[in-house]
Every structure is written in structure tokens, then in C-alpha cells.
Amino acid sequence: MLSKELLAALNEQMNQEYFAAHAYMAMAAYCDKESYDGFANFYIEQAKEERFHGKKIYDYINDRGEHAIFDTIKAPKVEFSSILETFKDSLAQERDVTQRFYNLSELARNDKDYATISFLNWFLDEQVEEESTFETHIDYLTRIGDDCNTLYLYEKELAARSFNEQ
């Protein structure tokens, strides 16, 4: 059985994952509006991944005999000045999520809830990958700058991204 504090924190994180999916869809909409189809695809696939994370937490809460509680999801930011800004915002969001998982892990450790600690380790590993991915994209976009030809090729690469549940 999960402690009340840990259950509340897991429910909050589940909702945060669904907010992240909304935020990535807002970024996809910006990219589509600006005719960056490859970047839009990247963010659509990223949103699928975040929904998968939310469902994973939902399943865990229910598997532990508790009740997953859905809350109102606030509206995400919808206006951006550039593709680079979307990636910088994404990195900030992922860093916030990483900190949330650290806090969840600390709660689970304090509760000596070893099953939850094990469950959360998957997310901690995932967050290392997420942050690295966005840092790399920011580096590439910064180097590309205003080079339209290179940006076009990079966008085509991102158009091929496809999320596969693991």
C-alpha cells in the first residue's frame, strides 16, 4: 500500500506527464503553423511518449490497489518565437520532470517502499535520455543558425522519428 503522501505525489506526476503531452502538442502546432513538418512530427511523437509515461504511472497506482486521480490540465504555452525556443522550453520542462522524479524517489526511500523505488528507477533512466536528447537538439540548432539548407536536412531527419513503447 502506498503512503498518502507518495500516492498524492504519484498522482501529481501522472498529471504532469499528461500536461507535458499537451505542451508538446502545442509545440507541434506551432511547428505545423510555421511549415516545419519534421519538427511537428518530432513533437507529436514526443507527446505520445509522455502519454505513455502517464499511463505507466496510472497502471502502477492501480496495480498497487490505489486510485489514479486525474486533475485539470492547465493550458500550455502556445506562442513561440522560434524552433530553438521550443527546444529550450522542452529542456526546461524535462529538467523539471527530472527533479520531480528525484523528489518522488526520496519520498519512496523515506517510506521504505522498495517496489516504488524500483518502479521510479525506470523513469530516472528515461530522464537522462530525455535531457540529453534536448541538449543535443539545442546544440545542433544553435550551430545551424540561419542556414536554411542544413535546417531543412535536420528537419527531414526528425520527420522520421517514431515513438515505440518499450
From Swiss-Prot:
TM helices/strands, residue ranges: none
Listed SUPFAM superfamilies: Ferritin-like (SSF47240)
Compartments it resides in: Cytoplasm
UniProt enzyme class: oxidoreductase
Family matches, as InterPro entries: Ferritin, Ferritin-like, Ferritin-like_diiron, Ferritin-like_SF, Ferritin_DPS_dom, Ferritin_prok
Catalytic activity, as annotated: 4 Fe(2+) + O2 + 6 H2O = 4 iron(III) oxide-hydroxide + 12 H(+)
One GO MF term attached to the UniProt entry: ferroxidase activity
Binding positions (Fe cation 2): E50, E94, Q127
Alphabetical keyword list: Cytoplasm, Iron, Iron storage, Metal-binding, Oxidoreductase
GO CC aspect terms: cytosol
Alphabetized Pfam families for the sequence: Ferritin (PF00210)
One GO term of the biological process aspect: iron ion transport
Binding site for Fe cation 1: E17, E50, H53
UniProt-listed Enzyme Commission number(s): 1.16.3.2
Family membership: Belongs to the ferritin family. Prokaryotic subfamily.
Purpose: Iron-storage protein.
Protein name (database record): Bacterial non-heme ferritin
Protein source organism: Staphylococcus epidermidis (strain ATCC 12228 / FDA PCI 1200)
